[in-house]
Amino acid sequence: MSQEKYIMAIDQGTTSSRAIIFNQKGEKVSSSQKEFPQIFPHAGWVEHNANQIWNSVQSVIAGAFIESSIKPSQIEAIGITNQRETTVVWDKKTGVPIYNAIVWQSRQTAPIAEQLKQDGHTKMIHEKTGLVIDAYFSATKIRWILDHVPGAQERAEKGELLFGTIDTWLVWKLTDGAVHVTDYSNAARTMLYNIKDLTWDDEILELLNIPKDMLPEVKSNSEIYGKTAAFHFYGGEVPISGMAGDQQAALFGQLAFEPGMVKNTYGTGSFIIMNTGDEMQLSSNNLLTTIGYGINGKVHYALEGSIFIAGSAIQWLRDGLKMIETSPESEQLALASTSDDEVYVVPAFTGLGTPYWDSNARGSVFGLTRGTSKEDFVKATLQSIAYQVRDVIDTMQVDSGIDIQQLRVDGGAAMNNMLMQFQADILGIDIARAKNLETTALGAAFLAGLAVGYWEDMDALKELNATGQLFKASMNESRKEKLYKGWKRAVKATQVFTQEEDADDDAK
């Protein structure tokens, strides 16, 4: 009797790694998760030890097998999804990283980004990569490592060093150094990849003095890249056949295959992506243009809005302010609030993302009175997530000319019913919460399974991740717009506060 076959998704995130095994119905059969340490060398810097990431991945692969009694020989293919932009540079011969991985959130390379802007490269980089110049992306992180590790530039020029985002690093490790590749979606987040020509861009590489030999080969999101070395996959030589950055994997897992479909993942941050089809649309309002996925020889472009603080605002209530003991408790407290929504929290702890891109802004609170309670404060913090999403959705509609009718949602904070209802109200559209909230891992599994024929085609996937719950807008138009105007005033005041500080510094 033949054994049942499965797909394994490796979901390598910002704070933890997970391995999830899916069956042919797209159901989770087994999973394992392991956190790893965050490294904060200085204020605003965030780093990871790339070997600790690899160790955590090895651990969760084993954990998923142990929990389910599934054998490595039963895994038909592996899909990888990952925290994007996070940058690793390692020795080609030994496989040892020459510096910690610099994480997407880290601001240590902001001076390099600022210099690129001052030198007048904003338009050129935007037109080629679809991105704004920011420390968020990989390019300045590579430059920083080559500048700060003695001898690194020279070694890179000799072809002794390799660069990769986390997908590349994991494939390199799983194949024991046999394969150095990335995929369209991750390459599109480096600020080095020309998303129109689908090539590493020589002009940008020259500008940043980054040797092309360091860079991985760019592949589609669904094809066989290589096989695991048996000793790295508990005896199994299994095809690695799907890869996508976490937010693009979620777009695919949400089955947002048609132009105009939009998904939002409420994680640490909140990332809203709209499928714009086979045409690259440049934003004139600070959205990012990126590659959603490339499959069967066809690239699908996307517009993306990045919100830096979403779920982490709830963690701040729990860990920083000690207002709640668990994240789910925020919903009960918010529902108990009797305020008239006059309190606004602007959680700009690491600046503001789309559409403001103001890295100097810092968190602020407005509208407090003597009667403001803990419940009111918690509700305002949850509402801040929804207001930020409205900022992005409004911008997307202007840029794309598409009237968005529905937002597909997933991620941890999407479980908060109060937040989802307020999100529907403040947007005035339907919110469709996925039945299977593991959409990021599911997207990676779908991409891997398609490449090896585990699922026949994209139509076969459409039954596998239905809507779990629909939230419909119920707030009247005048109240909705009054609340949103208050939010816009709060954001403006937040920006003015730090601008005044910058002006004071300049005057000294």
From Swiss-Prot:
What are the binding positions for ADP in this chain?
Answer: T14, R18, T268, G311, G412, N416
Q: Name one GO molecular function term.
A: ATP binding
The pathway noted for it is:
Polyol metabolism; glycerol degradation via glycerol kinase pathway; sn-glycerol 3-phosphate from glycerol: step 1/1
Superkingdom, taxonomy of origin? Bacteria
Sites of Phosphohistidine modification: H232
Query: What catalytic activity is recorded?
Result: glycerol + ATP = sn-glycerol 3-phosphate + ADP + H(+)
Write out the GO biological process terms.
glycerol catabolic process; glycerol metabolic process; glycerol-3-phosphate metabolic process
Q: Where does sn-glycerol 3-phosphate bind?
A: T14, R84, E85, Y136, D246
Q: What does this protein do?
A: Key enzyme in the regulation of glycerol uptake and metabolism. Catalyzes the phosphorylation of glycerol to yield sn-glycerol 3-phosphate.
What's the protein name? Glycerol kinase
Organism of provenance: Streptococcus pyogenes serotype M28 (strain MGAS6180)
